[in-house]
Amino acid sequence: YQVGENIEVTIPGSSQGKALVSVETGSQVVDNFLIQTNKGNTSFSFKATADMAPNVYLNITLIQPHAQTVNDLPIRMYGIVPLKVYDPGTVLSPQLDMAGELAPGKEVSIKVSEKEGKAMAYTLAIVDEGLLDITNFETPDPWNHFYKREAIGV
């Protein structure tokens, strides 16, 4: 899902039950809903927000009416579903304005900017390409590192 999109959730349940749906990140409860369930499937939706990126977990607790005899399911059932949420506002596109080649001992001028003008912090490292080739080093994608899936922690 992308920030701003509707997230549609379908919960199987019994009539006259309740579902407590908690939207959780790795460190906090972002939102929660108490839903009246219908026989069969119950659907509801909510909007994906920026604080749900890079992922959230839907922690669903389904509670049936006490002393019901319609089915033999437990009174309480639990389930957790992970959801990925993409926030395009977190993607940075740094640009370098510099000479095509650098020579040892020579002065160099490098201008660093972000394509969309977003604020960013950066570290600049100048490394010999031959050294990187010897070690088969592949330059990592920082966004994939900092916005990888978080473990549930609530």
Label for each model-derived stretch:
Residues 1-2, 96-102:
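Short beta-strand segments of immunoglobulin-like
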Residues 6-27, 55-62, 105-127:
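Beta-strand-rich binding/interaction modules
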Residues 7, 40-46:
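Short strand-edge motifs at loop-to-beta-strand transitions and within beta-strands
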Residues 26-30, 39-42, 90:
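Short acidic loop-to-helix transition motifs that present clustered carboxylates
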Residues 28-33, 51-84, 117-154:
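Acidic glycine/proline-rich low-complexity segments
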Residues 34, 46-48, 71, 98-100:
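Outer-membrane beta-barrel proteins
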Residues 38-40, 49-52, 101, 105:
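Short gly/acidic/polar-rich coil/turn motifs that serve as flexible hinges in modular proteins
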Residues 90-96:
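Proline-enriched interdomain boundary motifs that mark the N-terminal boundary
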